């Protein structure tokens, strides 16, 4: 991050509770160390920066513990500094699922099973894996009427792709090399190559692709490292695409150096993409 970016899709595992006693409003929040990736630090103590905001929507005002705004060029650096014990732990979350769909009209029954694994190896390393994911529980996108010549950008709300995705961002939020919403998007077709089945191919085109698996590894340190891979399932009259991304990033004094490489294998069209 450049110190002033916000992520509205961040949905970490934290707990909070509020109460009113003697006319005073209290709020307590439990934030586990595993909530975010942090660079490895030597020694028994770790220094971190924090700030707290409270928004009063009724009057359109916000109150903060710091003298700074996300709209200013300098933001994270003005956070208050705290020192804690240098704790490092590991956490493993496993979310299996199974679904059964019964189509009475076509007398068709479809069953699916899969799982998502989130392994926080330590404070700086994390490995995420999803097998045959089901993203049916993800909230729908807002309706946007767009008459411009440019495509509307929708952020990815799927948990696997949303978590630690900022590792693969470059420059600012308006300059995106990777759009994970493409993964699992509309399949590629070449119906003209199927002869007598061309019309049937046109009629059975799918709007989305199933994902066989996806893997993401991120590591924070002197050199930040990230790798992501995803493979789509072959559909009727279509072959799934394969996606790869590699990210390296480091800082030296006031300069930041980075590399982002992406590759997409498109077996149907043969137009493989490499950036």
Where are the model-predicted features located?
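Conserved catalytic alpha/beta cores of large enzymes that bind or transform nucleotide phosphates
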Residues: 262-263
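Structural preference for beta-rich elements and adjacent junctions enriched in aromatics
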Residues: 1-250, 256-259, 269
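Short acidic loop-to-helix transition motifs that present clustered carboxylates
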Residues: 266
């Amino acid at each position: 991050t450049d110190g002033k970016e916000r992520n509205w899709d961040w949905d970490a595992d934290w707990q909070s509770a509020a109460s009113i006693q003697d006319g005073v409003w209290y709020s307590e929040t439990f934030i586990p160390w595993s909530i975010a990736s942090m660079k490895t630090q030597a020694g028994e103590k770790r220094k971190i920066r924090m700030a707290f905001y409270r928004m009063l929507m009724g009057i359109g005002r916000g109150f903060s513990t710091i003298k700074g705004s996300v709209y200013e060029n300098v933001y994270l650096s003005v956070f208050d500094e705290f020192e804690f014990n240098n704790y490092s732990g590991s956490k493993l979350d496993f979310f299996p699922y199974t679904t059964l769909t019964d189509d009475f009209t076509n007398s068709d029954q479809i069953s699916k099973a899969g799982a998502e694994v989130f392994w926080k190896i330590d404070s700086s390393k994390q490995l995420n894996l999803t097998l045959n994911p089901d993203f049916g529980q993800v909230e729908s996108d807002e309706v946007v009427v767009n008459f411009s010549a440019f495509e509307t950008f929708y952020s990815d709300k799927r948990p696997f792709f949303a978590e630690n995705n900022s590792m693969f961002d470059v420059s600012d939020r308006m300059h995106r090399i990777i759009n994970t919403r493409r993964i699992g998007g509309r399949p590629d077709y070449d119906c003209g190559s199927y002869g007598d089945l061309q019309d049937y191919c046109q009629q059975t085109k799918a709007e989305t692709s199933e994902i066989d698996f996806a893997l993401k590894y991120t590591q924070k340190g002197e050199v930040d490292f990230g790798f992501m891979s995803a493979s789509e399932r072959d559909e009727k009259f279509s072959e799934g695409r394969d996606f790869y991304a590699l990210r390296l990033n480091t800082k030296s004094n006031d300069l930041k150096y980075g590399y982002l490489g992406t590759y997409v294998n498109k077996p149907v069209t043969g137009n493989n993409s490499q950036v």
